[in-house]
Amino acid sequence: MIVSPCDAPKTPVKRLRSALLASSALVCLFSAGQLWAFSLDDVAAKAKEMAGQKFEAPRSNLPNELRDMKFADYQKIRFRDDKAEWAGDKTPFKVSFYHQGMHFDTPVKINEVTATSVDEIKYDASRFDFGGLNIDPKTSEKLGYAGFRVLYPINKDDKQDEIMTMLGASYFRVIGKGQVYGLSARGMAIDTASPSGEEFPRFKEFWIEKPGPDDNHLVIFALLDSPRATGAYQLTLRPGTNTLVDVKSRMFLRDKVNKLGVAPLTSMFLFGANQPSRVPNYRRELHDSSGLSIQAANGEWLWRPLNNPKHLSISSFSVENPRGFGLLQRGRDFSQYEDLDDRYDKRPSAWIEPKGDWGKGTVELVEIPTADETNDNIVAFWKPETLKAPGEEMAFDYRLHWTMQENSIHSPDLGWVKQTQRSIGDVRQSNLIRQPDGSLAFLVDFVGPVLAALPEDKTIRSQVTTDDNVELVENNLRYNPVTKGYRLTLRVKVKDAGKATEMRAYLLREIPAEPGKEPALLVADKADEKKAAAKEAAAKEAAKPAVAKESANDQVEIAKADAPKPEAAKPEAGKADASKADAAKGDVAKADAAKADDVAKGKDGKDIQQPATEAAPTHPEPAKTLQVMTETWSYQLPSDE
């Protein structure tokens, strides 16, 4: 017979009876805790159930006096710090709330989760100071909270600072120590930049686990709803110098979507060094993020500087199981921004680190025209290649890094782009005066420990590709003693300003070849070997003039990419290794062609061997190969620039 510890019979043995009673109390307490255990599975069950039901649009409960208020008036509504959730408890985390107002017209349900219960945190008007606004108390009786903030002593032990905000749709922003709010993350994006219009899912309910006195993390669950999708999320917030958010997401479709955005990031780019302001401005740069960074599964890195285009621009980068991607703010010098109010130099980068197998898909970058910095015009997200049928679960887990230490994200084995500068191209005349020549100049600074360890290495060269919409008139690589890196200067002449132009560049280094071994980043996939062989043969045909040009001008070869298809130039980060291998093999082909120049021609056209003194040495130089030294700079010059 199996006896439940909660109903254990009495025993005449006193010590045994005491032991059983103690065991009974522990097991019953554990059972009670298990009864109230709350997890992502509970939220996922709700999301799955909703996905099988018709979408119910949220209804606004705002009175006109709150709905029609201006932003300046909305800001007057202050939350009372002494009324924060857990204000009297010994926990490092506190939670305060946003009042409804303006377009934040629909309340969200917020619950507190403890070891024994799940309870709704009810709206309480006494938690707010309305700043002299004439708000009728009766009109606010049935209101709710629009969202919430998380407070934590991240900068000083005796001061609670706001480190996370959840307000509007599925947006949330996070900062680390010494940072100020910048770009946002979202739970989900649907049909971003589609002709049919974007759908904005919203978090409709939250569950916040009450932390203990010594807890250094906060767990938040969220239920997402939208006309064509639902979702369940677990966000574990870990404050620090680099604040982390571990995200577990479970998504369900209600209906077909054209484009599902996973781990979306939203930012702002008005102007910067690569696209200067069209009107005079004391701020040289004004943006929350300066570029998109991607790390492919094969270890290659790609950097895409952002633009504020005149027309909507969408770029797709094919990557299978990416190691990471994000919108980064490269450049932390105050002198780059000169803004004492908005401190763009302290705005964090956001880096997405996928967990598990994400499969095939693309990282998509959307750049939207904007006239001022109040509009978020940059979106980046992961778009899965295939989606599951409505009602079936899709799981995407990832870690979100909010950091100002971008160098710690990047691989130390490769250099990266510190900055991209753009200016009018010019040529120095015989009188030493620089004269514009109708070209555009791009100066790309590559830096990093791997480059700093090789100062003025003459074996480092650039590999540049462009589409057919530009003429590349200069490709010059110089050592930069200030950054201990290399500066690549490109001058281009655009053929059709009405078309966007694609350019790519990275640095290579000539190293001795190891028998039977090639640098990993220069080895093409087996499927591409035939294509590489064909390109090598073509390179041999063109090698003589190319080598002669390089020798005369002391410049590296300028490679041209195939013309883009009519739709758009869509870079594919996942295929870049093969192209790098082709480029390296092409250089080997040039060497072969150069050797052919040692064979002279007679008057009758027959080959004449050179004298024996000109023959190849008995001990030829060791074979050389090329090693990729930097990430790939991938730049799009927008149309009508």
From Swiss-Prot:
Residues 561-607 have a biased composition (Basic and acidic residues). GO terms for molecular function: carbohydrate binding; catalytic activity. Residues 535-554, 561-625 are annotated as: Disordered. Residues 1-37 form the signal peptide. One of its GO terms (cellular component) is outer membrane-bounded periplasmic space. Pathway: Glycan metabolism; osmoregulated periplasmic glucan (OPG) biosynthesis. It is found in: Periplasm. Gene3D superfamilies: 2.70.98.10, Immunoglobulins. GO terms for biological process: beta-glucan biosynthetic process. Keywords: Periplasm, Signal. Belongs to the OpgD/OpgG family. Involved in the biosynthesis of osmoregulated periplasmic glucans (OPGs). HAMAP family: MdoG_OpgG. This is Glucans biosynthesis protein G. It comes from Pseudomonas syringae pv. tomato (strain ATCC BAA-871 / DC3000). The gene is opgG.
